[in-house]
From Swiss-Prot:
GO terms for cellular component: cytoplasm. This is Gamma-glutamyl phosphate reductase. Pfam families: Aldedh. GO terms for biological process: L-proline biosynthetic process. It is an enzyme of class 1 (oxidoreductase). It is found in: Cytoplasm. It comes from the Bacteria. Catalyzes the NADPH-dependent reduction of L-glutamate 5-phosphate into L-glutamate 5-semialdehyde and phosphate. The product spontaneously undergoes cyclization to form 1-pyrroline-5-carboxylate. The keyword Transmembrane does not apply.
Length: 416
């Protein structure tokens, strides 16, 4: 089954690569319209997925990721329309010039070909990924989690209906709707057809893909994000940033999970932190020293060492006291996932050190980690947030779904 999908996707990718920006935007507009016209069908499928997930005991954080509402679906359709307004990178000449030999050389952006994406309980990923792939002339094979298989199937049918209406092959966007996990292993070996693989899920999925895939893999999306409150930080703005980074949407990968507090500000900062976190219903995890200082109304529980590596995706926050900026940087190096980390400080020397020494995809000074997002960065919808250094890093927008080719123009030109 998968080989036939691969063959069809590869054939579709050749046709997509030839589309003009105007033709691709027409397809995206049609997809957005169909998503809105088929809202009831998609929400009905999603309701079944949510009910099954709740029955299976999924956490509130996972249920939040899984659930669609009319407003969320409208937002997804609007995101597709926003992709229409993004600059199409395909065909752009990155650099080039006339060589001494007389050969005129160009390095031009082109589609990657076929993208494979494996993801878990995030139904919006289906549309986000499909729209970005189509905008860049790529075909895509999707493998969503079993928790969302009804939602994904309904959504892909809507997308394929739009493709067909625009005279394009339905195989440009395909989904593996069989929940059999063995198909993931088979997909990982489809290097004959899939040019790049993007896993969006937990550490186990990323490990499986890195170890078993014969396809180039882009990993990321696991966010053990840190905020370091330096000794010179202004308390009121710091609290506002922390509340935003922890509570705006706790189930996202750019949510802060560990707060590092300089020991020189701890006596003044931790009690007011407890007050603020109580108002946001956040549970604070701290060691004995932190617990003694962090008096206040917030719920507090002892910090377990293994929790320093946790991506909670919930209203839980580790609080760790550090001696200085060196201690903070070393902690992030040991426990971070190279996703998003921030420093809150009025000391620009320390800010510069943090920016230069913390090796993460996104580093912030006096700002929330929640900004690590394709839309916030002006990239439009994102296919993933890469925490590696090749071939993309940070929010992956349109350019990350392209490669380039060298094109030489001559006039009977030969090499001397």
């Amino acid at each position: 089954m998968l080989e036939q999908m691969g063959i069809a996707a590869k054939a579709a990718s050749y046709k997509l690569a030839l589309l003009s920006s105007r033709e691709k935007n027409r397809v995206l507009e049609k997809i957005a319209d169909e998503l809105e016209s088929q809202t009831e069908t998609i929400l009905s499928a999603n309701a079944q997925d949510v009910a099954q997930a709740r029955e299976n005991g999924l956490s509130d954080a996972m249920l939040d990721r899984l659930a669609l509402t009319p407003a969320r679906l409208k937002s997804i359709a609007d995101d597709v329309r926003q992709v229409c307004h993004l600059t199409d990178p395909v065909g752009q000449v990155i650099d080039g010039g006339l060589l001494d030999s007389g050969l005129r050389l160009e390095r031009r952006r082109v589609p990657l070909g076929v993208i494979g994406v494996i993801y878990e309980a995030r139904p919006n990923v289906t549309v986000d990924v499909a729209s970005l792939c189509l905008k860049t002339g790529n075909a895509v094979i999707l493998r969503g989690g079993k928790e969302t298989h009804r939602t994904n199937a309904a959504t892909v049918r809507v997308i394929q209906k739009a493709l067909k209406a625009c005279g394009l092959p339905e195989a440009a966007v395909q989904a593996i709707d069989n929940p059999d996990r063995s198909l993931v292993n088979e997909m990982l070996r489809m290097d004959k057809y899939i040019d790049m693989l993007i896993p969006r899920g937990g550490a186990g999925l990323h490990k499986l893909c890195r170890e078993q895939s014969t396809i180039p893999v882009i990993t990321g999306g696991i966010g053990v994000c840190h905020i370091f409150v330096d000794s010179s930080a202004e308390i009121a703005p710091a609290l506002e940033i922390i509340v935003n980074a922890k509570t705006q949407r706790p189930s996202t990968c750019n949510t802060v999970e560990t707060l590092l507090v300089h020991q020189d500000i701890a006596e003044r900062f931790l009690p007011v932190l407890s007050q603020q976190m109580a108002e946001s219903d956040v549970t604070l995890h701290g060691d004995e020293r932190v617990m003694q200082i962090m008096k206040g109304p917030a719920k507090r529980i002892p910090l377990k060492p293994e929790e320093l590596d946790n991506e909670f995706l919930s209203l839980d926050l580790n609080v760790v006291m550090v001696m200085n900026i060196d201690h903070a940087i070393n902690h992030i190096r040991e426990h971070g996932t190279q996703h998003s980390d921030a420093i809150l400080t009025c000391d620009m020397h320390n800010a510069a050190r943090f920016v230069n020494e913390v090796d993460s995809a996104a580093v912030y000074v006096n700002a929330s980690t929640r900004f690590t997002d394709g839309g916030q960065f002006g990239l439009g919808a994102e296919v993933a947030v890469s925490t590696q250094k090749l071939h993309a890093r940070g929010p992956m927008g349109l350019e990350a779904l392209t490669t380039y080719k060298w094109i030489g123009f001559g006039d009977g030109t030969i090499r001397a």
